[in-house]
Amino acid sequence: MAVTMAVATIAATTACSPPEKDSGSSGSSAASATSVADLGGLDKLVAAARAEGRLNVIALPPNWANYGEIIKTFGDKYGITVNSAQPDGSSQDEINAAEQLKGQDKAPDVFDLGSSVAIANVARFAPYKVSTFADIPDNLKDPAGTWVNDYGGYMSIGYDSAKVPAPASLADLLKPEYKGKVALNGDPTQAGSAFGGVQLAALANGGTVENIAPGVEFFGKLKKAGNLLPVDPDSATIQSGQTPVVFDWDYLNASEATKLKTWKTFVPGGTVLGSYYVQAINKDAPHPAAARLWQEFLYSDEGQNLWLKGGARPVRAQAMEKAGTIDKTAFAALPKVEGTPVIPTEDQTAKAKEYLAANWAKAVG
C-alpha cells in the first residue's frame, strides 16, 4: 500500500541526512499531534523521531506475536534505539510503570494492553490516527484514535501430546489425568490472556463474556482438584514439561510448536472467544514522535504482516486481503477455528472485570 511505500522511501532519505536541529519544538508538536498531517507529513515525523533517537516499549516478549522481529525491524529501519522493559510484564505492569516513571526519560512511550486494563486507563492515552486508520473496522477503534485494536486471536488450550491426552473440551481438564498440569497465563485480574481464559471457561459452562461467574467457578474446581498449577507459563516451563497444559491465545500456543514438536493447540468448538489487544500512546511519552512513528509502522502493511508472521491476526487483515498486500502463506497457516467467535464489547469487559476483581481471589486464591 502507499503508506508502506512512503515509510520506506522516507526512511531511506532521512538516513542519509542529519536530523532537524529544532528537536525541542518537534517534540512539543509531536506530543499534541493527532495525525501525521499535524506534523507536516510522514517525513517530518520520521525526522522528529530520529532526533529523539529512542523509543521505550514495555511488556513485549520477543516470542509474543513476533515482537522480537518487529522491534528489531523498526530499530534498524529508522536508526532508533528501542528500549524494551519488563518483557514478561503484564498489562497492569505497563500502567504501573507509566505512573511510577512519569516525567522520566525511561517511562513507557507506548502501550500494548489487554482490553480490560485498557478500558480502565483511557485517560492515560494520547489520541492519534495512523495513516491507515480508515482500514480498521469501526468497532475495533476509538473514533478519535485514543485507542486502537492491533492484533488478535482466539483463546485456546495448548498441550504437550507426549505428556497428556488430547482434551476434547474444557471439562476434560478436571480429570485426574491432568492433575498438576494445567496453567493459566498470568493473573486474570491483571493479564489479558489470563482474563480471556476465564471468559472462555465461562462460555463453556453456561455463562457469557459478561457473566463470568461460571468461569471463575470452573477454575475454582480446577484448583480444588489439584489440577491448576500456581505457575506463570512461558517457553521455558513448556519445554521443560513443567506446564504441559496452558490456557493462552492461539498464536502464542501455536508458536511453541516450533520449539516443542509435541506441542498442540486446541480451540474449543462452539465456545470460540476472540479478542484483540489494544495499542495506545502514553500521553506523557518522553519520546512522543518516536511513539507516533511506532504506531505508523505497526499499522503499515509491513508491521501488520510481521504480526501475522507470528501467528496473530492483524486488525487490518480484511483490508489487506482485499488489496492483495497480506502475506498469503502466513494467513493460510493460522489455526483453524470452528464456530462463530464471540468478541467482548467494552461494557461486557468492564462488568466481567468488576466481578473478577471481587471474586477471583476468593475462588482460586
Predicted regions and their residues:
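Sec-dependent bacterial lipoprotein signal peptides
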Residues: 1-14
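Extracytoplasmic ligand-binding site segments that recognize negatively charged/polar headgroups
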Residues: 56-71, 83-99, 105-242
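A ligand-binding cleft/hinge motif common to bilobed small-molecule-binding domains
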Residues: 116-122, 239, 244-262
